Amino acid sequence: MNSSFLYHAWGLYTHKCTREEYKGNTIILHIESKEREKVCPKCGHRQLVKNGFRIRDFIGLPIGGKKVIIRMKVQRYKCKNKDCDYDRQEKIPFATGSCSYTHRFAKYVVGLLRGMTLKDTSNLLGISWDTVKEIHARHLEYHYAPPSLEGVASIGIDEFAARKGHVHKTMVVDLKTGHILY
């Protein structure tokens, strides 16, 4: 598969597709990293060796109504330096932690949720309601979490009328940066 297509469709610019599978209404792309790690990120030693691998599946953006599974061979690396204990798997730039979906898929789900319910979105994409809810909760937590109060030295408080009558709102602002705290 063309690596330019992998990059533009799913953001896989450091990976290559080794083969494709078609099972029912699902496209499975088998990918692996283009280049292997050569230098230990912990000690800088140049003898980093492969130490096994694991296969992980990620839900990718659908194509033409077909579900896309990105099946990645995640390589583990171990440092040969006796003083170093580095033994980790390679980084996965298109997904976070143990998530089973890509960043672009999560962005797509959030876009659909602007006009659809959780149930409708899960039915359309053929994924569980729990996965859609997890994506939505992560999005809300990231964008609407309370701001950090670290480094705030002085605040300003303003109360204003939202509508004429007895509806008042209070706003708390960091006076140095102008960021709204509450």
Task: For each feature predicted by the language model, list its residue ranges.
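RNase H-like nuclease fold core
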Residues: K133-Y182
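Secondary-structure boundary/capping micro-motif
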Residues: R19, K78, L112, K176-T177
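Residue-level detection of the helix-turn-helix DNA-binding "recognition helix"
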Residues: H45, G126, A137, E141
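Short, Lys/Arg-enriched anionic-surface-contact patches
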Residues: D85-F105
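Short, basic interhelical loop/turn and adjoining N-cap
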Residues: L113, K119-E134
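Mobile genetic element proteins and their domesticated derivatives, centered on retroelements
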Residues: L29, C40-C43, C79, V109, ...
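Short, conserved DNA-binding cores of transcription-related domains
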Residues: M1-Y86, E90-I92
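Short, amphipathic alpha-helical "recognition" segments used to contact nucleic acids or chromatin
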Residues: Y101-M116
